[in-house]
Every structure is written in C-alpha cells, then in structure tokens.
Amino acid sequence: MYSGAGPVLASPAPTTSPIPGYAFKPPPRPDFGTTGRTIKLQANFFEMDIPKIDIYHYELDIKPEKCPRRVNREIVEHMVQHFKTQIFGDRKPVFDGRKNLYTAMPLPIGRDKVELEVTLPGEGKDRIFKVSIKWVSCVSLQALHDALSGRLPSVPFETIQALDVVMRHLPSMRYTPVGRSFFTASEGCSNPLGGGREVWFGFHQSVRPSLWKMMLNIDVSATAFYKAQPVIEFVCEVLDFKSIEEQQKPLTDSQRVKFTKEIKGLKVEITHCGQMKRKYRVCNVTRRPASHQTFPLQQESGQTVECTVAQYFKDRHKLVLRYPHLPCLQVGQEQKHTYLPLEVCNIVAGQRCIKKLTDNQTSTMIRATARSAPDRQEEISKLMRSASFNTDPYVREFGIMVKDEMTDVTGRVLQPPSILYGGRNKAIATPVQGVWDMRNKQFHTGIEIKVWAIACFAPQRQCTEVHLKSFTEQLRKISRDAGMPIQGQPCFCKYAQGADSVEPMFRHLKNTYAGLQLVVVILPGKTPVYAEVKRVGDTVLGMATQCVQMKNVQRTTPQTLSNLCLKINVKLGGVNNILLPQGRPPVFQQPVIFLGADVTHPPAGDGKKPSIAAVVGSMDAHPNRYCATVRVQQHRQEIIQDLAAMVRELLIQFYKSTRFKPTRIIFYRDGVSEGQFQQVLHHELLAIREACIKLEKDYQPGITFIVVQKRHHTRLFCTDKNERVGKSGNIPAGTTVDTKITHPTEFDFYLCSHAGIQGTSRPSHYHVLWDDNRFSSDELQILTYQLCHTYVRCTRSVSIPAPAYYAHLVAFRARYHLVDKEHDSAEGSHTSGQSNGRDHQALAKAVQVHQDTLRTMYFA
C-alpha cells in the first residue's frame, strides 16, 4: 500500500501490563523533525533567566477560613507590614492567595509553627484574623536547571509552581485574576455585549519549561464580565426594556424566570445605607412584588409580625419605593428570608460571567476581540513593556530576569497531501494554503439518490413553492456535477409546523416510501425543530436527515449547495475523497485504526446536566469513513468512564468493515488539560488495552496516545512580512514547531494545519503520552497533518485531525438528542434534558443512536 521513499516503521514495542498504581511515563522525544521548508517565526514566549538558588516554601493557615483570595492577599500584606521588625525584615514574600508563601531568604522562625494575629480595617468594624506560618521545604532552582538540560528525568512540579507564584504576585494585587489571566475594566471605553455583560481585556501569563530555558508565555486575552450598574438597569438589559418606566405592571412569570436565571449567584451591593455598601450574593428572585412580599419582623416588644418589604423600607429607612410592583432579590442563605428591593442594589464590579454567552453575544465578542496576527504581536509586545517584569520588586527579590523580546523559533512548513477524487478523470487536488476546490471533480464514491423527501418547517409565505422548486433544481444540478446524482423529483414535499409534527411526519414517510434514503428539512432560523429532527432521525427511526436554513433555499449559491452535497454523500455511505495512497506515511503498510475521543461538558453554572463522551473510529484504509460511539457520564467527569466498551465496539466494527484486525491503534484525545495528563493516560490507556485483550487473549496492537490541545496561549508569528498569509497576516497552513518552545524532554509539537481566516491562528498542540509504535517526529507530524485534510464537511484542511473533530461533533449532536421537548428551551447546546432530573438510564438511552444509523456518519 505504501510506495515511495521513507522509513519503514519499527514493529510495535511489547506492551507490558503494568502493576496497579504504576504511573505511565510519557515517551522521550525520539528526534527532531526535519521535513518541510524552514520558516523563521517568533513565539509569544519570553526567556527567563533564573538563578541557581533555593527558595523557601511556607504554609499559611488563615482563620476564619473560606475568605476570597483577594482578602487573603490583603491579610498577608498587612501581616508582612505589621511584623516587619520581628519576622519579615526587608524580605518581600510572595503568596498564592490560598496557603503557599515563598521567600528568597529563610524567615527567622526555624521549623516551628508561628501563630500571628492580623487586623484588617473594615467598612464597619475591624476584622481580626489568626494566621499560622509553618516551614514546608526548600525548593531548589538548581534542580530545575538540571531538568531543563535533560540531566534530570522530569521537571520538578514544585519549582514551576514557586516561580509561577513569584511572577503572579504583583499582577494579582493590581488586577482581577481569572484562571491564569488578569483583567481590568477598559478605561474610558466600554465594550457592551448586551444582557448586562461587557468585554474586559487583559493578559494571560504562565511559566513554562522548555528546552534549556524557562519561558514566560504572555498573550492578550478577553472575557465577559457583568457590567457594574444599578440592578434596575440590569433588569432592563436582560428583559429588553428601553427603560424601566415602560414596565408599570409586575413581571410576568416568564420574565421573572429569565431575570432569575441571569442574576442568581451574582453579588450585589446596597445603596440605601450611606457609606456602608454591604455586599450580598443573590440566591433567588421573589414571586411577589415588594409591595406584597412579606417577612417575619421582630418588634421591640419581642412579638413577630408579617411586614411587607415596601412598608419596612418606608418605616425603617424613610424610603418610599419607586418601583413597588417589581420583585425583590432574595440574598444570603435561602432560609434566612433577607429581601432587597431591586432599586437599592447595584451589581458589584469585577464579576466574571461564567454562564454561556448567547449567539449574538458570542459574535459581538469575536468582533471586539479578533486581531490580525501583526496587531496581536504588537499588543503582546506593548503588554510586555507595560508589565516591565524587570522592575517588579517581587521578581527582582528572587533574582529573576525576563527578556522583553519574543523568542525566535525556526519552524517548518510541511507539504500538504494530494487529495484523490473519483469519476472518470480521477482528478487529484493539491491544497494551496490549506484550501482546494471541487470544480471539475467528482466524489471518489458518489451515492445515487433515488428516493428522497422534503419537509419544509419554514412558513409557506416566506419559503414559497417557487423557492422549493428552484432549490430542488439547483441542488440536483450541483449534485450531478459532484457525482452524487439525485434522480427525479422528491417523492414527498410538504409544509409542516412545530417540533411536535416531526415524529408523526417522519413515521409516515418511513412507512409509506420504501427505500427512502434522505429527508431534506428546511428550517426558519434557530428553532426547537432542529433538535427534534435529529432526535427522531438519528435515535428513534434511523433516517438520514439534512437540515437547510430557509435563507439558503430562498437564495441558493453553488457554494452552499456544494457544501450540502459534501455532507449528504457521506451520510448516505459515500466517500468524498481520499488521501493519495502513494503519499501516505509508512504506518499505512499494516491495518491501522484511527480513534478520536472527546468529552464535552455542560455550560458552567449548570450542575445537573451530564457530560458526554464520544469516541469515533476509522472504518477503512483511506481513512475516510468513521463510526461513532457515545455515552453520558457524570457531570464534569473528564476521564471517559466506558472507554473499554466503546473501543471494543469500534474494533469489532472495523473488523466487520475491513476483515482485518488493526495492528496499530492511533488515539487522538481532545479536551485534556496538562494537569490531567497522568490521570487520563493511566485510566484510558488501560481501557484501550482491556478492550483488545477482551476480544482476544493475545491481541496486543501497538497503541499511540496523543493529546490534542487547542485551548492554550501559544501564538506564532512570521518574522518575514512576505511569509504572512491572507488578510490577517497569519502563519502558513502546515507550520510545525518542535524546538525551543516545546517540552524539554517529552514528545510534543505545535502544528498549525489550517489557514487562519479571522484573527490570529491558534496552532494545535500535540503531546504524545504513549507510543508503542515508535514514531519518528517527522512521521507523526506528517500523519497528523494529512489527517487534518480528511474532514468531510469542507474542502479545506482543519485545525485538528478529522477523528478528533468528529468526536467533538458526535458529542455535540448527543446534546441535541438529550433535549427534552417538555422541559427545555431550544437553545441548542445549552440544553440537555436533565432539567427535570431524568435519571442516568433514561439519559443513556436518549443518546443511543438507532441500529440503522449506527454504521453511518450521521454526525457529518
């Protein structure tokens, strides 16, 4: 199958079954890649010069506990000032906001625990805290130098942690920290998103080990915060009132529910007690307005009477409410019955929005934050100048210096694969900048469509029969050109309304038209009908469906019709194109299965919904066709619980499709952060092995386990302006980096496989956690790049390998399968039917696709 020069793959190394509790060690980097033309780049990594000293680590215990980090930082700052003469002297300790304190010189307390009392001046009365300090360990920076130069097998985690705390200490006092980033409200100009939210800009900062050097990774970042404003204005934004004056009546139930959803969990501060701006967290919104909402009020006589909130404010605060018809906020603990009228509350500044943004907010956010690569590069350089780490007294205390120029890196631009089409001329496409087209080409294997139907859920007056007829003709023409002939008119073409009519209509179609291959469904914008079409088609009846937006029917373009054909052909079992067999790497010499895996979690703040795990596996030698498996699992659980059973299903399916047993398994795992590498590898590698052994006692294919990461802050820029590509001035598709900014000893690389269209391209980061197949760097990089060209939905190279992308689509589709018509809004992926507490079994059943759908690429 493989002809052409290139190394022959080493046979898989024997895989020993490890002792329980044994930590798998990621393989060392085998070599550095050499193929491709070289390209000079700059990365947003800044070299750190670190002295070979010891740092002293102390543990703090602050009582009362559970203070926010911001308060803890104030306590420590007061403590260092107050006990300067007795303990701290001129030392500048750094603190992580929880319990870790580091100093450059030891404190004069020996190994004993020291108890101190610290007073914080408060708005009302002073607050007193008890702080204990205890020596933990000496952190050796010499050990770090040894690890970076390869003399030590692994980078000591505690040294990275200590350096991180040093570098973050000052920014944490100045800005609002969120994860590894720092934010501030934009001075002078606000960037509203609507719904009481706005964009805050800031920067990401993290300390990263790399070859020979520690690096500081700096990037610009942006996130959504709640606007500091009166709650009355917040209500108007959330419920789309021009002003509160137009709302003279109490809120309706649906308005109250919408408002509650937005404000629950937020902090508000009161405005009716002068300087005493007490803060509270909102736990609910009352059903009754302030004029009717009562609470038990204890009188001076000791008697308790029911009093309305409006009356209480009038008697106690001499405040006649302007909006007594609006509800109150219930704050603090639910059982305490503390109610505040909306008009005496403001939203506290600096609260990050963790709830999912609406589609409109997301697109506003992208418009506000997308920067061309050269602009982003300039912004990062500006950031470095203003951060001036070399004058930061805490950084200097530890003898650290940071270079203020970006790191120069040499990358390589890999050759794209040739793409083979079918038809008479068997045309070959050569991607240019990650893109090719289908003009004068036909699908490798096109499906002939004889029996098909149209169901139009758009109103007839907007999407007329003339529109449908014209759309049908255009679609048939384009499909014929693409080698997927749609024969004759649809056997059925009717209008329908609402999600409830989907199932009866589809049942009628299935029972009436033998051999029905496809239902084309026309939708009027965003609608609950989509989720229902997919639920019924994929899971209930096993019918292939293709949804089309009404606007694309009213105005057809060859491009949208061609894209539809790409999806339809694959759903019906066709093959759009394949990698040119002669150009594939040696791994294809023996039967190999490519697996892609991903876990998607429900949006933050949604505690009831399950996480969804999806694994897909290739089913042919190209590899082009894939099969999917999907499971629901515990909320926010990152490890794929049922992986062994899922992989077993896919291996059986592969054997049925090809009559071969794979000798190699290449597993691309998406959605794992660095902190979880060890855990995920240990559990999931064992699960894959278990799947093999359960099929056959001695079946031990070589496994390569690669984590794919897109959520990182590495950005690469062309040094030479002439190398920049497109309007956004990005790096070319195929740019690969495996030196200087990568791991000092482990096998990882960056690959930007797609052409950046908007904003700055984000290269994907690949980290090999296990490799029985002993890939060379070149071979794994080329294989990965080629797999990015096999994604069926478009004629472009995508940013991650097709199997990983498909796993993401499968999990995303399962969210729609979980939409529960009775209880969920149809906000697409914000929904998964758990709102009414359906049990795990019901959820598991809901995501299982129909027998007839199982072997198809229904998710395409």
From Swiss-Prot:
Modified residues (3'-nitrotyrosine): Y2
Residues in Piwi domain copies: 518-819
PAZ domain residues: 230-349
Subunit and partners: Interacts with DICER1 through its Piwi domain and with TARBP2 during assembly of the RNA-induced silencing complex (RISC). Together, DICER1, AGO2 and TARBP2 constitute the trimeric RISC loading complex (RLC), or micro-RNA (miRNA) loading complex (miRLC). Within the RLC/miRLC, DICER1 and TARBP2 are required to process precursor miRNAs (pre-miRNAs) to mature miRNAs and then load them onto AGO2. AGO2 bound to the mature miRNA constitutes the minimal RISC and may subsequently dissociate from DICER1 and TARBP2. Note however that the term RISC has also been used to describe the trimeric RLC/miRLC.
Protein's cellular compartments: Cytoplasm, P-body; Nucleus
GO CC aspect terms: cytoplasm; cytosol; dendrite; extracellular exosome; glutamatergic synapse; nucleus; P-body; postsynapse
Protein name as it appears in the record: Protein argonaute-2
Cofactor: Mg(2+); Mn(2+)
Keywords from the named record: Cytoplasm, Developmental protein, Differentiation, Endonuclease, Hydrolase, Hydroxylation, Magnesium, Manganese, Metal-binding, Nitration, Nuclease, Nucleus, Phosphoprotein, Repressor, Ribonucleoprotein, RNA-binding, RNA-mediated gene silencing, Transcription, Transcription regulation, Translation regulation, Ubl conjugation
Residues that coordinate or bind a divalent metal cation: D598, D670, H808
Modification 4-hydroxyproline, positions: P701
One Pfam match: Piwi
Region spans: Interaction with GW182 family members: 588-591, 651-661
SMART domains, sorted: DUF1785 (SM01163), PAZ (SM00949), Piwi (SM00950)
Catalysed reactions, semicolon-separated: Endonucleolytic cleavage to 5'-phosphomonoester
UniProt-recorded Gene Ontology molecular function terms: core promoter sequence-specific DNA binding; double-stranded RNA binding; endoribonuclease activity, cleaving miRNA-paired mRNA; endoribonuclease activity, cleaving siRNA-paired mRNA; metal ion binding; miRNA binding; mRNA 3'-UTR AU-rich region binding; mRNA binding
Gene Ontology BP term (one): negative regulation of translational initiation
Family listed: Belongs to the argonaute family. Ago subfamily.
Gene source species: Mus musculus (Mouse)
UniProt tissue specificity: Ubiquitous expression in 9.5 day embryos with highest levels in forebrain, heart, limb buds, and branchial arches.
